[in-house]
Every structure is written in C-alpha cells, then in structure tokens.
Amino acid sequence: MSSKEKLPSSRIAAAGPSQQPKIMTTIVRRALITGSTSGIGRAIAEALAARGAHVLIAGRNTQRGEQVVAAIRSARGQAQFVSADLSSARSVAELATQSDKLLGGVDILVNNAGIFSFGPTAETNEDAFQSMYAVNVRAPYFLTAKLAPGMANRQWGRIVNITTMVAYLGMPGAALYGSSKAALQLLTQAWAAEFGPNGVTVNAVAPGPIRTPGTEGMGEALEQLGKTVPAGRVGTPAEVAAAVAFLVSEEAAYVNGATVSVDGGRAAV
C-alpha cells in the first residue's frame, strides 16, 4: 500500500458488556509491533487486530511473519508483514520509513522486540553487551524518535514498551538483561513527559515468567520461577497482550508514564 492510499474507515459501535473494548471509534488505528512473529509480540498483534487496528508485523522470520498475517486476515483483521533485524541501526531506520509508507502513518508503536541472556557479570563480554543494548535500547529509542513526532503532529498516539519484572527486581545473573530493560522503563517515563502534551501516551508493560517459544529453553526453571509469584504459575502471552490492548485504547487516554506489571503479583512481594 502506498503512502497516498487511505486505509478503510468503519464506524464501530460502542462496546457492550460482552464485547471487547475497541481501540478506535470511527477510524482505523495503525499499529507497528516489533518482534511480533511469535510469542508475546504475536499475541499483541492478534489482540490489536481483533479490536480493529491495522497491524504491521515486524520480525526477522518471514515465514512466521506471513503465518501471523494469514491468521489475522482469516479472522477478518488487517495485517501486513515487514522484515526487520533490529540489531542493525540501518534496519531500524528503514523499518520506521517502511512503516510510515505501508500504513500511511503509525498511531500505535509497541516496542516488543528484545533479546535476553543470563549469566555472571564477570563473564559478560563486550559483544554480548553491545548486542543486548542494540536491540533492547537503541532500537526502541530510534523507532520512537522517528515515529513519535508524527503522532504528536496528529495529536494522538500510543507507545507501549515491553520491559520485564527484572527491570525493577534484583536477580543474580540478570544484570545485563535487567539493566537494558530498566533503561527502557526510564525512557517510558521520559517520553511520557516529552510527548504527553501532544496527545501521545507512553507506557510500559512488565511481564513476569511467560511461556513463549523464546522461554522454552528454560525448561523446568521457568516452572520454578512461576511458583515464586503469588499467582503460583507461569503466565501466557495473551495475558500480556490484554494489558497492551487497554493501554492503546481510547479509554486509557489518561494513563501515561505508567508501568503495568503482568507478573502474577511478583512486583508486590
């Protein structure tokens, strides 16, 4: 779709008790979700599409990306896929440009893509440090830098950063990963102050232990981690997506600079 083509608009009735809350009322909101070919990102993309958004799936795996698009379209949603490797600064800039062209503007940005690894600080090498911060901090920083001004000009925008419970909880072996996400959490607050006066809200969602393809390698350790939270279990991507769906909705217009913990209560204890 070219930048000159207009996205279809449709009037959606106000949600009743049995209906899902809608992201928009009379126009289609356009959403970019990074790292959305699987796991939490895919669940977010599907949730926003189900609520009426036109979603742009971004990730490295084309096959998985097209599968997500097909699933959303089969449910009568609007979706497209764009290949992006957020470890590259050039690719980040290209993604911002492509998103604007494909969607005709981005109203909702979900900075979900991230990488993680755990280990002693003394065993962390510089390459691992640079890689972690490139994806977890640099990519969302410059995507926001490119896309938030357009939202501000239109006087409406939603940015949600996906962080983690270890961004605010000290955990052995999580210094590198936790610090990168803590940086994103601070950026959430700074951007809320910067862009809030122009109708753009910026919030974070901090998941706890969530079962995804990316955490499968943790094996029994994930289950044990789930038992440490008050809920006593591991969470699901859909539970994280539900929090994101609220934060990007019209109803959340007065929620800005907040971090919503989806961690089974771990932040409380």
Label every PLM stretch briefly.
Residues T144, S180, T188:
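Active-site helix of classical SDR
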Residues T164:
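Residue(s) in the substrate-gating loop at a strand-loop-helix junction
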Residues L103, Y141, W156, R233-V262, ...:
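C-terminal substrate-recognition "lid" of short-chain dehydrogenase/reductases
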Residues P120-T121, A128-Y133, I159, L225:
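Substrate-binding pocket helix/loop in short-chain dehydrogenase/reductase
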Residues G196, T201, V255-G257:
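Short, small/polar-rich loop/turn modules that mediate ligand/substrate recognition or access, typified
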Residues T37-S38, N61:
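Conserved glycine-rich cofactor-binding loop
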Residues P149, A192-E194, A253:
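Alpha-helical segment proximal to the catalytic Tyr-Lys
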